[in-house]
Regions:
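Rhodanese-like catalytic fold shared by cysteine-dependent sulfurtransferases
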Residues: 1-13, 19, 27-62, 67-117
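Conserved beta/loop motifs at nucleotide-recognition and modification sites
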Residues: 22
Length: 117
């Protein structure tokens, strides 16, 4: 079983310099939902696979997905753990976050890592 963090635990750590929230949703899911956890970084799986070296290796990375079974976040977590990162999955993903009534921000569809290159 992959290590997980509960939504309320993450909420109390938002803004913590030692925590990075990594949203691993695919572009179509990112665009469809139109919202994200405040301060999160969006990198789809392909970007994580290609560009994980840009992620901090001295922070806890909390991976957020939107697949009902959590498979997208688990896949990203496993890859990052294999590459030596300290990583956990957000329990319930984005759906769990929203269900708990926790804050979100709206975004534009093009705000991914690929826009930085």
């Amino acid at each position: 079983m992959d290590p997980r963090m509960h939504c309320t635990d993450l909420y109390f750590r938002l803004g913590d310099d030692e925590v990075l929230v990594l949203d691993c949703r695919e572009p179509e899911d990112w665009a469809r939902h139109g919202l994200h956890i405040p301060g999160s970084l969006w990198m789809c799986f392909e970007e994580i696979l290609r560009d994980s070296q840009v992620l901090p290796d001295d922070e806890l990375i909390v991976v957020v997905g939107c697949a009902p079974d959590g498979s997208d976040a688990r896949r990203a977590c496993r890859l990052l753990r294999q590459r030596g990162f300290n990583v956990v999955c957000l329990e319930g993903g984005l759906h769990g976050w929203v269900t708990h009534g926790l804050p979100t921000e709206s975004h534009v569809a093009a705000a991914s890592m690929s826009g930085l290159w």
